[in-house]
Amino acid sequence: MDSGRDFLTLHGLQDDPDLQALLKGSQLLKVKSSSWRRERFYKLQEDCKTIWQESRKVMRSPESQLFSIEDIQEVRMGHRTEGLEKFARDIPEDRCFSIVFKDQRNTLDLIAPSPADVQHWVQGLRKIIDRSGSMDQRQKLQHWIHSCLRKADKNKDNKMNFKEVKDFLKELNVQVDDSYARKIFRECDHSQTDSLEDEEIETFYRMLTQRAEIDRAFAEAAGSAETLSVEKLVTFLQHQQREEEAGPALALSLIERYEPSETAKAQRQMTKDGFLMYLLSADGNAFSLAHRRVYQDMNQPLSHYLVSSSHNTYLLEDQLTGPSSTEAYIRALCKGCRCLELDCWDGPNQEPIIYHGYTFTSKILFCDVLRAIRDYAFKASPYPVILSLENHCSLEQQRVMAHHLRAILGPMLLDQPLDGVTTSLPSPEQLKEKILLKGKKLGGLLPAGGENGPEATDVSDEDEAAEMEDEAVRSQVQHKPKEDKLKLVPELSDMVIYCKSVHFGGFSSPSTSGQAFYEMASFSESRALRLLQESGNSFVRHNVGHLSRIYPAGWRTDSSNYSPVEMWNGGCQIVALNFQTPGPEMDVYLGCFQDNGGCGYVLKPAFLRDPDTTFNSRALTQGPWWAPKKLRVWIISGQQLPKVNKNKNSIVDPKVIVEIHGVGQDVASRQTAVITNNGFNPRWDTEFEFVVAVPDLALVRFMVEDYDSSSKNDFIGQSTIPWNSLKQGYRHVHLLSKNGDLHPSATLFVKISIQD
């Protein structure tokens, strides 16, 4: 019943010195500020899933002193966070490390007694994170159940009495009445000792994890046989799963990958266990495995792609008083974001700073942000990053900005047109591992400066930070008159190549267009919606050859988001959302951009790339986009839905909502009934049907909520899948947390079919 020992043995780490050191624990200095350093004891728990941290706070619960390794985004060595950069410069880098969490909680900055201790912690945690990520769903399930068993075994005798079984079921997030729990307990207690041990616990585990719905699906495929032959598996892959490449080769590869029985594998058979392993794998995911890599044509002009884009990237919270942080840039880049916003203002000591102008948000150095971008720009994707500069700096500090851009970004920075690319926008492929600037520019594509150029020139100032047109917003921030002109130095201007910010002058026919291909306009969400309503097709055509950036309305001081879908339907590429604000809009956004390998660029459908298109999402007509499909979604069951309320006695009452996002007439929502007191294995067996007219623009969102009769339902998890990435047949939908991180074992089991 020792899940940690099982984990170490499974991965050959039982004698690993790093993990042995973590299991023993060590005294570390926790750093919060220049005046706050406290010695605390940290120790890896025996389950190899959690870290215990000593706390001196009075009345702190034991649970609050634990954090899960699953919640760790990364472990950094040295002065690699703002905290250690500011508050631990006096300590050698080889004694410092940081634990960065997936959600927006504070980073844990630590100082170790010696470099060897740092190595143990950094390498040990990385090994657990890497090995946990490589575990299949069955191993994750076993590891999780063993952890719950260990927690429930209060007296640590490796036996389970009836009370401990009840506690165990609560850990699993399932409420069972006493008589049913007692019935299972007696069935497993073969030794009649009023406790379960060894094989009895294994029997109990098997009874608990048996899935009748998998048995039913297996029987559909295998008939009365105990195993699936290659021929029957091919038939299942063709007729149920609708796999395009269904054939003996695919069937054999699935048997080879997922069948745990060596005997069955040798006989080219798949058992029920192998069938479940397949359905829980990436091959059985409702999101297409083929779309987990870059598969689209990346050689088209930038304007032909949707670009993952962040608004006010520097903010971690709201836009009036919240903290600014380089960590916010790192998080956005790690989520595949390719367009970041830098709101630049004069700072002390001739160093430009970034913050939300005229407000009380905290300030960070421009140069520190550039270093973070340099280090993380291409970790999640090799495709270009666009830095959207909101420049409010004096001429002197603009020159400092230009110096930092060259010195810090070096050859990553695109500071001149690509050879031969002077008549249309370059492609993402041509711009691989390049950083582009979006901002004001003097003159045209080629530099206007040089030795004989002017030292500075006026340009119109239409950026959004100066815009804050909503009176309600203005009343909440420091009064600052808007200036119509901004002086711009050539050193900075010359670095803007393919993304020159201009005022939008209206739609023209391509032959008489007043906007050059390298010029782009920004629109507030309200203005963009107005243009889509009044001139929808003109906006679509404009966006075939030009980039358009959309940003949230000025009244969204709480950093709330708008729906990106309408903007995408109009062909707008750089639809900027507040990445720091979780919610349905961000769910749909990240769902769209998990397509094409999560590289941050998604090719628009052909009818949004055609300069002669007649498409208008607000006035649909017949055309290549009109391809009505009937979508049937059968919500069968859920698995290991996480507790929302961490109260020990709390059990979730889950319900599933299926939403369609797309053009107006396709938007729809359906929901299941509520299953009470069962987050471990709820069964719904509920079928929904949707008719989708423009599937190329549709996304399907699966959301699970915890029903509450007296207040708003609590969010449990969700997954949003672009229509063209949705797989048919029996599939598992792997749920994400509100911050977009994968719940390790939480899934929905569904059956999907699409018909003309």
UniProtKB/Swiss-Prot annotation:
Binding-site residues for Ca(2+) 2, renumbered to this chain: D189, S191, T193, S195, E200
Gene Ontology CC: cytoplasm; cytosol
Glycan-carrying positions: S191, T193
Record-listed Phosphoserine modification sites: S460
SMART domains: C2, PH, PLCXc, PLCYc
Binding annotation for Ca(2+) 5: D706, Y707, D708
Keyword Repeat: yes
Domain PI-PLC X-box: 296-440
Domain PI-PLC Y-box: 492-609
GO molecular function, one term: phosphatidylinositol-4,5-bisphosphate phospholipase C activity
Keyword Phosphoprotein found: yes
Disruption phenotype: Mice lacking Plcd1 and Plcd3 die between 11.5 and 13.5 dpc. They exhibit severe disruption of the normal labyrinth architecture in the placenta and decreased placental vascularization, as well as abnormal proliferation and apoptosis of trophoblasts in the labyrinth area. Furthermore, Plcd1 and Plcd3 double knockout embryos supplied with a normal placenta by the tetraploid aggregation method survive beyond 14.5 dpc, indicating that the embryonic lethality is caused by a defect in trophoblasts.
Subunit structure: Interacts with TGM2.
Region named Disordered: 446-465
Gene3D superfamilies: C2 domain (2.60.40.150), EF-hand (1.10.238.10), Phosphatidylinositol (PI) phosphodiesterase (3.20.20.190), Pleckstrin-homology domain (PH domain)/Phosphotyrosine-binding domain (PTB) (2.30.29.30)
One Gene Ontology biological process: lipid catabolic process
Record: residues binding Ca(2+) 3: N312, E341, D343, E390
Lineage top rank: taxon: Eukaryota
Database matches in PANTHER family: 1-PHOSPHATIDYLINOSITOL 4,5-BISPHOSPHATE PHOSPHODIESTERASE DELTA-1, PHOSPHOINOSITIDE-SPECIFIC PHOSPHOLIPASE C FAMILY PROTEIN
Disulfide bonds: none
Catalytic activity: a 1,2-diacyl-sn-glycero-3-phospho-(1D-myo-inositol-4,5-bisphosphate) + H2O = 1D-myo-inositol 1,4,5-trisphosphate + a 1,2-diacyl-sn-glycerol + H(+); a 1,2-diacyl-sn-glycero-3-phospho-(1D-myo-inositol) + H2O = 1D-myo-inositol 1-phosphate + a 1,2-diacyl-sn-glycerol + H(+)
Protein name as annotated: 1-phosphatidylinositol 4,5-bisphosphate phosphodiesterase delta-1
Cofactor field: Ca(2+)
Binding site for substrate: K438, K440, S522, R549
Residues covered by the C2 domain: 609-737
Cited PROSITE patterns: C2, EF_HAND_1, EF_HAND_2, PH_DOMAIN, PIPLC_X_DOMAIN, PIPLC_Y_DOMAIN
